[in-house]
């Protein structure tokens, strides 16, 4: 039987139990709320700081840094940065070489069926080779406008293919100082050069009737050129005078003119796919010269063919056929009338 004291004790226990139970539920609820808050609102101080999201890597932008050969491309263009300072050993030239001129310093090998015109007509096959170029020493440019001074070494040699040992017939040696300039579509070249000519020893031995001439001269020449917009063609004209000639009785003056045409440039068939950037351009030109010593008779060279080049390169290779009619352009035979038909490989740097 329960006593009053027991009843009071049980009541006290119930009250205490209820308080303890309530306290447990409060602690449990606090733990749940704290746990939820921990996951929903994480404490930044205890969580490692996240790195800022990185932007996706951008692909490298390939810019067209292809340089332009001012002899053929970018004619008359100005630089966005304005005029540059003096430049040592400038690349290529501002004046396009007169590649239809038989005596243009360049690298070539050609074969010609040659007819000597005159009372005693004769025919032979000639191999003609040339080595030379315009090497820029110093210049100043604003894009493709400006001026340049260089040095000009060259040799031109002709061989008799019908002889048993391919005898050297004649060799012309040239060295000079060219000054070239360009302003828009106008360009020009002034040259002071020396040329000496020599017969081949085998040719003299096999032709005892031939007399060697000690031919040499120093010439001052000037040529002006006007390009068509876009560089598809040009005309040029000028003249020269010999300031010293051996033999001294040779008349000194000459005139020189011509034109060039360039067809549309296209991807080179068969080559553009395995070698990207290879281009093909049809080319044609005619060069005319007349000399006071030869009574101003017009000497004509007509030449044309195909030119291969590469984007961003100064190098060009041409396969050309040609027809020449007039006095010989080769020193020791300058008074001999020739007619030549042939073709060859021409390389430009």
Regions found by a protein language model. Give the residues of each.
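Predominantly the C-terminal beta-signal and adjacent terminal strand-loop region
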Residues: 86-101, 295-349
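Cleavable N-terminal export/targeting peptides
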Residues: 1-81
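Outer-membrane pore/translocation modules
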Residues: 69, 144-261, 325, 334-337
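Residues on the lipid-exposed face of transmembrane beta-strands in outer-membrane beta-barrel proteins
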Residues: 131-137, 177-183, 222-226, 257-263, ...
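Transmembrane beta-barrel strands of outer-membrane/channel proteins
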Residues: 109-113, 151-155, 190-194, 237-241, ...
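Short loop/turn motifs that connect adjacent beta-strands in outer-membrane beta-barrel proteins
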Residues: 95-103, 136-149, 227-234, 263-282, ...
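Transmembrane beta-barrel domains of Gram-negative outer membranes and organellar outer membranes
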Residues: 55, 59-180
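Solvent-exposed loop/turn segments connecting transmembrane beta-strands
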Residues: 120-126, 163-165, 244-253, 289-300, ...
């Amino acid at each position: 039987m329960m006593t009053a004291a027991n009843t009071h004790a049980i009541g006290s226990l119930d009250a205490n139990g209820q308080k303890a139970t309530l306290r447990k539920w409060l602690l449990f609820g606090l733990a749940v709320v704290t746990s939820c808050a921990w996951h929903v609102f994480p404490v930044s101080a205890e969580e490692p700081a996240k790195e800022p999201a990185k932007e996706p890597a951008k692909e490298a932008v390939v810019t067209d840094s292809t340089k332009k050969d001012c002899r053929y491309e970018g004619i008359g263009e100005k630089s966005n940065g304005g005029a540059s300072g003096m430049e040592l050993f400038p690349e290529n030239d501002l004046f396009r070489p007169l590649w239809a001129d038989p005596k243009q310093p360049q690298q070539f090998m050609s074969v010609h069926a040659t007819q000597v015109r005159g009372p005693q007509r004769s025919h032979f096959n000639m191999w003609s080779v040339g080595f030379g170029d315009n090497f820029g020493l110093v210049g100043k440019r604003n894009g493709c406008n400006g001026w340049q001074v260089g040095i000009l070494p060259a040799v031109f040699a002709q061989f008799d293919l019908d002889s048993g040992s391919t005898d050297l017939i004649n060799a012309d040696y040239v060295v000079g100082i060219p000054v070239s300039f360009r302003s828009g579509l106008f360009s020009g070249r002034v040259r002071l050069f020396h040329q000496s000519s020599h017969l081949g020893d085998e040719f003299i031995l096999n032709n005892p009737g031939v007399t060697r001439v000690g031919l040499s001269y120093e010439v001052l020449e000037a040529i002006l050129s006007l390009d068509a917009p876009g560089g598809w063609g040009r005309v040029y004209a000028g003249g020269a005078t010999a300031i010293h000639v051996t033999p001294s009785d040779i008349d000194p003056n000459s005139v020189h003119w011509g034109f060039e045409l360039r067809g549309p440039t296209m991807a080179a068939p068969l080559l553009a796919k395995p070698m990207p950037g290879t281009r093909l351009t049809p080319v044609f030109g005619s060069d005319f010269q007349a000399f006071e010593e030869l009574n101003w008779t017009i000497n004509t060279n007509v030449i044309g063919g195909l030119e291969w080049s590469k984007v961003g390169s100064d190098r060009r290779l041409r396969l050309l056929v040609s027809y020449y009619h007039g006095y010989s352009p080769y020193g020791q035979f300058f008074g001999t009338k020739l007619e030549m038909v042939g073709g060859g490989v021409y390389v430009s740097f």
